[in-house]
Curated annotation (Swiss-Prot):
Family that this chain belongs to: Belongs to the UPF0250 family.
Family annotation (SUPFAM superfamilies): YbeD/HP0495-like
Range of residues in the leader sequence: none
GO cellular component: cytosol
InterPro entries for this protein: UPF0250_YbeD-like, YbeD-like_sf
Originating organism: Buchnera aphidicola subsp. Cinara cedri (strain Cc)
HAMAP family: UPF0250 (MF_00659)
Domain of life: Bacteria
Name the record gives this protein: UPF0250 protein BCc_307
Length: 87
């Protein structure tokens, strides 16, 4: 999958992460903080709540300079204790 993704992307490019995690106020802030550390900028994440309000789906788009940047962000976002899945 990684090789296919590398071949499909031409850098720099926009790349959207969808992060699904527990519905806690600090989740969005933690996601933005990690992204700001790698790629400073203004971000406007789209946030959707699950039907029961247990989870949040947060979509955030970045401008990636290379594949390593995409992979590193994916790994760091996955380490947030409230995160259940990163797409």
């Amino acid at each position: 999958m990684t090789n296919k993704l590398k071949k499909m992307l031409k850098f720099p490019c926009t790349f959207t992460y969808k992060v699904i995690g527990l519905a806690q106020p600090e989740l969005t802030n933690n996601i933005i903080k990690i992204i700001q550390n790698h790629i400073p900028g203004d971000y406007a994440p789209q946030i959707k709540s699950s039907n029961k309000g247990t989870y949040l789906s947060i979509s955030i788009t970045i401008c990636a300079k290379n594949f390593k940047q995409i992979k590193n962000l994916y790994n760091e976002l996955s380490k947030i204790h409230l995160v259940r899945m990163v797409l």
